[in-house]
């Protein structure tokens, strides 16, 4: 059994689809009850809770041998900041995984994650990675680039801007290279690493 945190999110839906396509049993950890409809077609188990709740996570991990941790935020809100969700949340998920004897922990980080507080999002993702690395668990960390697909917020917004205006935005004076990846490709890669922990 595989537990996917953030299963109802943009990446989570693709991961769940890829895992189920490969015949894997999946339990989805979802915070907001009505969001299960986004993965209901895949015939998965549901567990509800918050990644900041150790007891909810441990309950969801019973009978699970692999955890795919996808919960993260890319924009801060009043009650959710990068440190709380991306760092502390990952620490709590790894603690629950360790205490429940999880065999393999798969963590989704971000391309460019770094130990530099000048970039709060990337720094929080790096701190999350450190929590995974120091957890004692067998782990795999993914650092995908910007992802596109149904429901993405970046590429679709960029495409809309290009359609609306005759200008194409240039990132970093044109010297920064972006190599977007399909969210379905990310889901497929995560589903493949489940059987090959490294």
Model-derived features: where do they sit?
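Conserved beta-loop-beta element that borders a ligand/cofactor-binding pocket
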Residues: 130-160, 164, 169
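Conserved Rossmann-fold NAD(P)-dependent oxidoreductase catalytic core, especially the SDR/UDP-sugar
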Residues: 27, 73-74, 82-145
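Structural motif
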Residues: 1, 65-66, 104
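Conserved glycine-rich Rossmann-like NAD(P)H-binding loop of the short-chain dehydrogenase/reductase
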Residues: 24-31
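Substrate-positioning beta->alpha
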Residues: 92, 153-154, 173-195
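NAD(P)H-binding glycine-rich loop region in Rossmannoid oxidoreductase-like domains
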Residues: 34-38, 44-92, 96-99, 111-115
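N-terminal Rossmann NAD(P)H-binding glycine-rich loop of SDR-like oxidoreductase domains
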Residues: 2-22
């Amino acid at each position: 059994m595989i537990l996917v945190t953030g299963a109802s999110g943009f990446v989570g839906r693709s991961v769940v689809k890829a895992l189920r396509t490969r015949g894997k049993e999946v339990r989805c950890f979802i915070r907001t009850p009505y969001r299960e409809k986004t993965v209901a077609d895949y015939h998965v188990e549901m567990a509800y809770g918050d990644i900041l709740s150790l007891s909810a996570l441990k309950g969801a991990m019973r009978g699970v041998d692999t955890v795919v941790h996808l919960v993260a935020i890319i924009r801060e809100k009043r009650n959710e900041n990068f440190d709380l969700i991306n760092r502390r949340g990952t620490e709590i998920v790894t603690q629950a995984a360790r205490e429940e004897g999880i065999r393999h922990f798969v963590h989704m980080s971000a391309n460019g994650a770094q130990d530099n507080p000048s970039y709060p999002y990337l720094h929080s993702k790096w701190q999350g990675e450190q929590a995974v690395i120091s957890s004692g668990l067998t782990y795999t960390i993914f650092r995908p680039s910007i992802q596109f697909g149904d429901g993405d917020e970046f590429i679709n917004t960029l495409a809309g801007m290009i359609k609306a205006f005759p200008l194409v935005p240039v990132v970093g004076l044109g010297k920064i290279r972006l190599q977007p990846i399909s969210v379905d490709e990310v889901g497929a890669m995560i589903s493949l690493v489940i059987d090959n922990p490294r």
